[in-house]
Amino acid sequence: MATETLPELKKVLLNEDGQTALALRFRALFSLKDMGEKGDNGAIDVIAEGFKDDSELLKHELAYVLGQTKNFHAVKPLQGVLADTNQQAMVRHEAAEALGALGDKGSVAMLQEYFENDPLEVIRETCELALERIKWENSEAAKTETLQKSAYTSIDPAPPLPTDQAEGSDKATVEKLQKTLMDKSQSLFHRYRAMFRLRDIGTEDAVLALATGFDDSSALFRHEIAYVFGQMSDPASVPALIKVLGKTEEEGMVRHEAAEALGSIATDDVLPILKKFAEDKDQVVRESAIVALDMYEYENSNEVEYAH
């Protein structure tokens, strides 16, 4: 990472000259994230200033990043975004998820209110997950469960199921997890736990099991499947992701996540698909494809890390 100062990164992230490409703004954001993780509250404040932007994609990423910093200075701006009904649903959802990722017990009352009363399903479901995550994090189970050490550093909306509930990575375990993944009689949180256990198993069978999640009725659930595929970066998920991205009737939050996932997989067959959807009429899909193309170039270059 280049050693830009906070004012320089702020200038790029907030597009102060009006001419900064979105992909560069994303790179500045990831540099600011590193600073925020190390306790730099000024970096958190700069990220929070970005919520005034027009780009739904950028704002949702700002919220996601704030949730990953483990920095409680981010709580207040995230609460403000969740409460702001003028913000796009995808941005508000990401703010609620970020409050869950931070594990902020002080946000429980607010999350409960929006879980019970928000008119949008995606917000209600996200608040449900955030509440369950905070509850789990402060439970005995969090101390006693044996979780597989994950290859991923992200703070997820739910922890994976413990290994004693889904041991090994054989076909039978994957089939059992797939049934849990799609079992509507289970809580959303429990189904997410099955999702992240499948991610951590990481076999091709696990990828194919996860792909069945695209048939779920919840847009939030479908978008999380695409997000997980982006983390796994397994070429076996490409056909399912291309199919989702090509469904113009699908929710933008799902299609955009599919575009980003394809960018992180970065196989040769992905490039023409991303170029096509960089012209999509849905702004969040279009911008995601443009950022994904930048990620594709990075994945196929010798750059050390994706940051400004």
Swiss-Prot record:
Pfam families in alphabetical order: HEAT_2 (PF13646)
HEAT-like PBS-type repeat residue numbers: 91-117, 221-247, 254-280
Cofactor binding description: Binds 2 Fe(2+) ions per subunit.
Residues holding Fe cation 1: 60-61, 93-94
InterPro entries: ARM-like, ARM-type_fold, Deoxyhypusine_hydroxylase, PBS_lyase_HEAT
Main location: cytoplasm
Role: Catalyzes the hydroxylation of the N(6)-(4-aminobutyl)-L-lysine intermediate to form hypusine, an essential post-translational modification only found in mature eIF-5A factor.
Protein name (record): Deoxyhypusine hydroxylase
